[in-house]
Amino acid sequence: MALFEDIQAVIAEQLNVDAAQVTPEAEFVKDLGADSLDVVELIMALEEKFGIEIPDEQAEKIVNVGDVVKYIEDNKLA
């Protein structure tokens, strides 16, 4: 499974939305109905799934699915 599909599955499960709604452009709050607690829990789930740490200052910059994909691509192998 490609990285995007892995991320898409985590987001869909965490936010209880259909995976088809989880597009690179989808914003967590505006498009997927997440609140601030949902976003924190989502970041934690992504950290656990991919074995990475997303510092708070970086997490604040992640507003859509594409941001997550880029961050994980850039940091997963670091």
Swiss-Prot record:
Gene Ontology molecular function: any one: phosphopantetheine binding
Keywords recorded for this protein, A-Z: Cytoplasm, Fatty acid biosynthesis, Fatty acid metabolism, Lipid biosynthesis, Lipid metabolism, Phosphopantetheine, Phosphoprotein
Pathway(s) annotated for this protein in UniProt: Lipid metabolism; fatty acid biosynthesis
Main location class: cytoplasm
Residues of the Carrier domain: 1-76
SUPFAM superfamilies per UniProt: ACP-like (SSF47336)
A GO cellular component entry from the record: cytosol
Free-text description of this protein's post-translational modifications in UniProt: 4'-phosphopantetheine is transferred from CoA to a specific serine of apo-ACP by AcpS. This modification is essential for activity because fatty acids are bound in thioester linkage to the sulfhydryl of the prosthetic group.
Signal peptide from the UniProt entry: none
Keyword Phosphoprotein in annotation: yes
Entry keyword DNA-binding: no
Disulfide feature: none
GO biological process: lipid A biosynthetic process
Pfam family, any one: PP-binding
Residues annotated with O-(pantetheine 4'-phosphoryl)serine modification: 36
Compartments it resides in: Cytoplasm
Sequence similarity: Belongs to the acyl carrier protein (ACP) family.
Entry-linked PANTHER family: ACYL CARRIER PROTEIN, CARRIER DOMAIN-CONTAINING PROTEIN
Function: Carrier of the growing fatty acid chain in fatty acid biosynthesis.
Protein known as: Acyl carrier protein
Organism listed in the record: Helicobacter pylori (strain P12)
